[in-house]
């Protein structure tokens, strides 16, 4: 996530999915707290519609996109989404512009779902890292130390 947000040549090809049939255990809260408070302006919570220019712009403007209540997509929708996840640049025609412009893909994706078998893709799901969770335990995070270690790595 950090490398994708700070280096134009890096794209995070993996979508983190937290799955649980248990409601209200903190899946969304966990994802929202992956970023320190100072960077939460770069967090978007939405499902990406590839035909919506505002949604595409979020991929170039956000550090993290929370696909809250991600309940799977049809085959065609999933293929389009997988393409968006791995696309190096996002081409957007800004309002009143004559031509599209290319913007670096800075966003990483994470999401929550309410059942384990959320993906129905016979070609494989290498882009999705699914974790089944039964409970969440929250600890106080020293974001300065965490991000210092990430930068060092």
Name these PLM-found stretches:
Residues 1-60:
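P-loop NTPase catalytic core of nucleic-acid-dependent motor ATPases
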Residues 39, 78-102:
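Conserved catalytic/switch belt of AAA+ P-loop NTPases
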Residues 54-60, 94-112:
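AAA+/SF3 P-loop NTPase mechanochemical coupling elements
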Residues 61-63, 105-108, 123-129:
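Short glycine-/polar-rich loops that comprise or flank the Walker A/P-loop
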Residues 63-86, 119-124:
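Conserved AAA+/SF3 P-loop NTPase catalytic/coupling segment centered on the Walker-B
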Residues 113-118:
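Short, polar loop motifs at secondary-structure junctions
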Residues 119-138:
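A short helix-turn-beta junction within AAA+ P-loop NTPase domains corresponding to the substrate/partner-engaging
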Residues 132-153:
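C-terminal, non-catalytic macromolecule-binding modules
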């Amino acid at each position: 996530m950090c490398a994708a947000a700070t280096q134009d040549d890096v794209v995070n090809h993996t979508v983190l999915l937290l799955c649980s049939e248990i409601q209200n255990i903190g899946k969304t809260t966990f994802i929202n707290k992956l970023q320190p408070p100072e960077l939460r302006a770069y967090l978007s919570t939405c499902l990406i519609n590839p035909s919506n220019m505002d949604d595409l712009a979020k991929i170039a403007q956000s550090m993290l996109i929370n696909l809250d209540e991600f309940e799977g997509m049809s085959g065609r929708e999933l293929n389009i989404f997988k393409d968006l996840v791995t696309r190096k640049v996002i081409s957007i025609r800004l309002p009143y512009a004559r031509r599209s412009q290319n913007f670096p893909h800075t966003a990483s994706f994470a999401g929550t779902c309410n059942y384990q078998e959320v993906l129905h893709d016979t070609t494989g799901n290498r882009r999705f890292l699914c974790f089944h969770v039964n409970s969440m335990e929250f600890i106080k995070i020293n974001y300065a130390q965490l991000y210092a270690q990430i930068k060092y790595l």
